[in-house]
């Protein structure tokens, strides 16, 4: 079987795919096999482990200034890009093991999470799945859960909006395969696994990648052809 896997960070998924003008046309002037072959990327878990995490620039380059602001202001919005909140358990191996730093867009983009937008995204992927199915290709959609959304249940004082993206999307009828990364990684946090995300980064760590690849939800697709 052949598959196309589309991955998008959660906060950008609706911006990219919940559109009435989304162009699903597959060009006929290029060989489809060539297009997919040229766009393939191979991920090596060991190499991912050795990569240094990209640091949130404002938090890193202006550490002295922001630390002063942080101690004066306390938890909440640290600056224009970063929020800091206290967790009810240690989920990182850093010095601040129970502090969550997350990107402001994780909060800002929650305003797009309406049922109508999620239904439109699902509709577009169903249409794309039909197109690919006619060519003998199965579609997989794997949205990468935002850091705030994943760690939200553990924030002690939380006045922010709650995400409905994964919860509502999982209830809709699909012609494509949906990998629920929030569901997979939430189980890791329930077991108090640390550093699923890097403490000072917006992206998940090699541990998250490894856990997803080794999950039943992921392996059932390729080993058993199940969704």
Model segments located where?
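Extracellular glycan-modifying ectodomains
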Residues: 1-227
């Amino acid at each position: 079987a052949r598959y196309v896997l589309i991955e998008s960070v959660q906060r950008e998924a609706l911006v990219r795919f919940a559109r009435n003008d989304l162009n699903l046309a597959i060009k006929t002037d290029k060989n489809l096999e060539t297009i997919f072959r040229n766009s393939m990327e191979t991920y090596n878990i060991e190499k991912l482990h050795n990569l240094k995490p990209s640091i949130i620039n404002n938090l890193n380059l202006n550490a002295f200034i922001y630390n002063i602001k942080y101690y004066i202001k306390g938890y909440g919005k640290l600056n224009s890009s970063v929020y800091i909140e206290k967790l009810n358990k240690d989920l990182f191996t850093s010095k601040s093991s129970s502090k969550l730093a997350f990107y402001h867009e994780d909060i800002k983009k929650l305003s797009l999470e309406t049922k109508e937008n999620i239904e439109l995204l699902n509709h577009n992927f169903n249409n794309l799945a039909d197109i690919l199915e006619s060519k003998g290709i199965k579609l997989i959609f794997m949205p990468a859960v935002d850091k705030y959304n994943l760690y939200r249940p553990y924030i002690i004082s939380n006045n922010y909006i709650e995400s409905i993206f994964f919860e509502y999307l999982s209830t809709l009828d699909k012609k494509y395969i949906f990998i629920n990364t929030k569901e997979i990684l939430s189980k890791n946090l329930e077991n108090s696994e640390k550093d699923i995300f890097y403490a000072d980064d917006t992206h998940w760590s090699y541990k998250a990648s490894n856990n997803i690849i080794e999950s039943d939800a992921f392996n059932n697709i390729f080993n058993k052809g199940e969704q």
